[in-house]
A protein has these predicted regions:
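DPxDG-like acidic metal-binding loop motif
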Residues: 102-111
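ATP-binding N-lobe of GHMP and related small-molecule kinases
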Residues: 1-102
Length: 111
């Protein structure tokens, strides 16, 4: 299974905290920056995550289940009832600056 996905950054123009109270907000994509995720069949046994932008190079089982990236992967397996984990290389890259307010974490999750 080989797959590639990309998601843009975002900026919230107003209402960022209003959504907590079920009120509207206005957000727009920032297409000049993006997060990319590539999933490739791996010749190695296991699921290996390579995210150089955050200095993460690890096998899924070596990460705690509440690690942000590990938890998304584990929830996907659970949601789609995948009990037999495939051998994968997951490559994550992003041009969205971390902690910039442009939604780097959300873009990686969506991609």
């Amino acid at each position: 299974m080989n797959a590639f996905a990309s998601a843009p950054g975002k900026v919230i123009l107003f209402g960022e905290h209003a959504v907590v109270y079920n009120r509207p907000a206005l957000a727009v994509p920032v297409t000049q920056v993006h997060a990319d995720v590539e999933v490739l069949d791996s010749p190695r046994a296991g699921i290996f995550i390579n995210a150089p932008g955050i200095d993460l190079h690890a096998e899924l089982n070596s990460l705690p289940p509440d690690h942000p990236i590990a938890s998304v992967i584990l929830k996907l397996f659970q949601r789609f009832e995948i009990s037999q984990r495939p051998d994968l290389d997951i490559n994550i890259s992003s041009t969205i600056p971390v902690a910039s307010g442009l939604g780097s974490g959300a873009a990686v999750s969506v991609a």
